[in-house]
Structures are given as structure tokens and as C-alpha cells.
Curated annotation (Swiss-Prot):
Listed Basic residues bias regions: 145-160
Cofactors: Ca(2+)
Disulfides per UniProt: none
Similarity annotation: Belongs to the glycosyl hydrolase 13 family.
Protein name (record): Alpha-amylase isozyme C
Protein task: Important for breakdown of endosperm starch during germination.
A molecular-function term among this protein's GO annotations: metal ion binding
EC number: 3.2.1.1
Stretch list, region Disordered: 126-266
Amino acid sequence: MQVPIEHNGGEQTLLVPFRAHRPPRPLLQLGSRASPVSGFQLGVVEGEWRVVQPAYGQARWTTSPPPASPTSGSLRRPTLSASKATCWGGCTIWTRPIIEAFHGKGVQVIADIVINHRTAEHKDSRGIYCRLPPRLGPAHDLPRRPLRRRHRKPGHRRRTSTTSTSASSGSSSAGSTGSRWTSASTRGASTSPRATPPTWQRSTSMPPSRASPWPRYGRRWRTAGTASRTTTRTRTGRSWSTGSIVSAAPTAMPRRSTSPPRASSTSPWRAIELWRLRGEDGKAPGMIGWWPAKATTFVDNHDTGNPCIFYDHFFDWGLKDEIERLVSIRNRQGIHPARGRCCWLLPS
């Protein structure tokens, strides 16, 4: 398998081709961590869909939760007060009007389900929102462990706990997302995180959909676990790994289900060196190496047109020209999400 490298704007693009099955359908994704600006107003749909439509043809947009301030971590409790029954990161009353507006413009929509942090709606003894509702499993209250007593020599100063200090101040720590709005994560072994995506899909009735588990859920969470309980036409997910640079060659995706989803995607959480993007068996890792006809993306999925382009990168960050140039390179080479070719960007 030949792996040509293209240099563009200080970045390297890895292209791994395989058979085509569907016509190209680029996707524009509304960022799930949008700042509290006009990303969710209907006026944005009216004013900007014409900018995207000529550039990307039959664009498909994903919707996203209500705005959350980046300095406040996950969605704060007052944000979810509009509809506790349907809100889960994002809620139906926010999502459906946007989708209807896009449908009125002839634009297809995918619901973007991002499992990030659980909303901590209960305070601990310090007055910090870091206790989860009982229905999500045991509450995570920081500090989790008391300081161990040690025999100290006379005059030896007592050591303090770094975790306790950072949690008390509201800064980022194991169970805190900053600004005193801590939202401890739930482990992937719990049944609630694995059951949430299909429940959200059924309640909003918006197939197809995409689920992106937070890395802290662990590698036990798989797309097949969600797909087995849904009937959507397209199901994608991510298989997260750890570490800043994966030094070892990536391995194939574990075959944890006898009936895999119709369309899946795997992507590492951190960067993989270009020369290591080939498994021990000589094939590409993950879903592409295992079942190419069922894969929709490979390594990365934003700002490459494969298949997502982030809304905030395109409009808010002023990267419209750079992203369009990158997409034009892919279009000239006939590289599209449905063509099954992958694109991986790393700084040169």
C-alpha cells in the first residue's frame, strides 16, 4: 500500500486509499465546546449556510449542546434548567429548531452526541459542585482519599496533598473542570455512560448519529455497544488511546461484537508518528484494516474534510481560507469521506 505525503502550510497529510462505495458527502460540525456566541441561533443558519453550501456541496451539519464557557469546564447547572428531562449536554428544545431550519434549506443533519463530563448538580461540604446524581452511580467527592499518616522525625514538615489543594481552589484536577464547576467523570465500567447514547438517539429521533466517548471512560467502551441497541443508519464512534505520542505500532481494533455497526470509525486520542501508521500485520489499524467497507473515517476527523470541519474553526477562528485550501487539495486528489481514504495531519 503506497502512502504518499503532501506538504501544505507546514503540515503533513497521510493518504491511505481503498475502495470507494458512496458519493462524497462532506460534513460541517458545530463544535461541541462552543463559546457563548451565536453558534446556536437560527440567524446563523439563515446567514451562513450559503457560504458553506457552495464550498462543500451537499454539506451535512451536526448540532451541538447549548453554549458552555471554556473557562467553566462542562455545562453548568443553570444551563440545564430549561428542560431537565431532555437535557443531556444538549437538549431537544435547542436541537430540533436548528435541525428544522437546516432541513428548510435542504441541508442534512447529524446529531453529534459528545459524552464528556457528567453534570455535577450537588455540592460537597466545601460548596463545590462535584457530586453526581445518584442515578449515575456513586458520587465522586474530592478529595477521594484522606492523607496517609506517616511516622515523621522530629521537626519534619508535614506534606500536603496536591489533589486536595487544587480541588479546593476549583482549578483543574482529577475531578474538576475549573472555575468551581467541577464535574467528575463516570467510569466506563458503569452501565449509564454506555446506555446514554442510544437513549439520547431514541428520545430525539434523529438518525444517523455519532457518539464520541470521553477518553476517561476507558477503552472498554466501544461503538458496537451503542450500535447494538439502536437502529440508526450510520453509527460512528472513537476508540481512544493514551499517551502524547504512541511509540509502538498501532494494533487492530478488538473484535468485541459479532454484529458490528454498519459504519464505524476509530481514532487515537494522541498523535501517532507517520511511519507507525501500519499494524504488525501490514494493514492499517482499526476498522479500516479490519473491515474497510464498513469504515467511514480513519485517524482524525476535523479540519480535513474527512468527514468533519469544525464550525468554530471555519467561522470564529478566521481559518476559512486555510481550510478551503486544504479541502481543495483533497478534492483535486479525489479524496472524500465515502471514498474511504484517510487523512492525518501532524506538524512538520
